[in-house]
Amino acid sequence: MGNKMTKRISHFNIENAIIPGEVSASAHVPGENNIFPKYSSNINDRTWEIWCCEGINHEGAGVMFGFQRAAFNKKMGGGWRVQIIAVWPDGKNWYKALALPESIFEESMASGDITSVWKTADNSTNVSFTYHKVDNKIDVVVCIPGVATGKASFQGQPGDSGLSTSPSLGPYVSYMRPVGRADMTSDMIFHFPDDGTTRQISFSDGHGGFDRYWGEKLWLSIQSESYFMRAFLGPYVIQIIRLVSTEELGKQQWPIARLFHQGKLVCAPQRCGSPDEQGISQDTLVMSKVHDSDTGALSAEFHDKSTGYDLTFVEAGNARRRWTFTVRHQTKIWSLPIGPKGGNSGFVEHVCGGLAGETCEGLGVSGQIVY
């Protein structure tokens, strides 16, 4: 008998990992982290996967990381896309998109730990993340000499994980939060080539999380806009991802929203509703854009000039509790145009609310795309 497999590997090289024809994603496993690639051997020109994490501290300093395997990566830059973003409390921000030819995942079948490295052929530039299963922790390490270096860690908080809930973000995308609520530390240095200066983001009091998602159709073919946010305020943690489908697909709203209170998952909407809706039989998210720049909130720089959202989480069942929150754009993190009118905007969000009579306050990180 042969040796038992000690690890499984997914090694993507930009030159040969993209193939014609059909490819199938491996199945989602309820209750598990599902971090290892679902398309572990190849992707085609439609399928893709993303892993991302972000966090900020109470002052509004934060870092964000994105890792992507998609066919357009080869067309756009000749390598798998890695994004690193930083923001400081004074509004200064930093952005870098890398195109790296190799993306490697290794999972230990004994420990369940997963390490992913995105790198150049000679390994002179590399960005990696490691999931420590026993500790429920993600470590991100950046080694881009003369550009950015350092480490950020996301330690999962105790309590409900939400991993047993559905990952379906509409019919074509699966979305999960393997370490969805985390205490975060950062020790990163960023270089600014324009003036030759460097800035540090070093803290041990941040909050954030690590998400991953995968899909079988191109973003542009299924969505007209999207909004992502994770926020920590008092005893609450809010997690939202919502897609709005294209005109051809009926402008449907596809959300995966989660509300935690003191570590317990109290509301898990998989649908959006209207403020006056009656007879709600499922947890529901009511989400309304606002345009109140007179309050000092920022607006996006593209054709959608919203300054934030009003949110209501509605619990199904006899209790039918309602939690309401205001979300307002406080600090711009990034702003990237998409096409003639659309764009991708990121913000530090000021979030306030709770149950009736509560005024919990805190900060979050959001990303908003409009086409």
Curated annotation (Swiss-Prot):
Keywords: Isomerase. GO terms for molecular function: isomerase activity. The keyword Transmembrane helix does not apply. The keyword Lipid metabolism does not apply. Its EC number is 5.5.1.-. Pathway: Secondary metabolite biosynthesis. Pfam families: DA_C, DA_N. It comes from the Eukaryota. InterPro entries: DA_C. Belongs to the Diels-Alderase family. Diels-Alderase; part of the gene cluster that mediates the biosynthesis of varicidin A, an antifungal natural product containing a cis-octahydrodecalin core. The PKS module of pvhA together with the enoylreductase pvhC catalyze the formation of the polyketide unit which is then conjugated to L-isoleucine by the condensation domain of the NRPS module. Activity of the Dieckmann cyclase domain (RED) of pvhA results in release of an acyclic tetramate. The cytochrome P450 monooxygenase pvhE then catalyzes the oxidation of the C21 methyl group to a to carboxylate group. This is Diels-Alderase pvhB. It comes from Talaromyces variabilis. The lineage of its organism: Eukaryota, Fungi, Dikarya, Ascomycota, Pezizomycotina.
